[in-house]
Amino acid sequence: SADCCDIYSPKVVRGSMGAVFRLPFVVSDTISGFLNAHSELESYAAVVSASADKITTTPFASPCIVAVGNEGNGLKEETISACKHKITIPMEGRAESLNAAVAASIIMWEMMK
């Protein structure tokens, strides 16, 4: 979407170590619009919420879409609403949230179990 980073910016290409050229990408005006157009896919919104399903007990479908927001603002409400499932990473201690890359990594690790 227009408010996402440029996947071909030098920082992204360097940070991905070239993986950006081996992964499929989709450009859409809005994430929620894409999710609504592809309702056949299961979709998960990563949120900080006690009412969301814990990733440790979520049976992830394949293929699926997982939306992870940035550290400052999280996901837009329209994106959360468009996702079929709300998931959260159970945390102990005082930390309220995680860096988006760390959160995405943890979610993908759980998905691969």
What is each stretch, according to the model?
Residues 40, 63-70, 106-113:
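Short flexible/disordered coil segments
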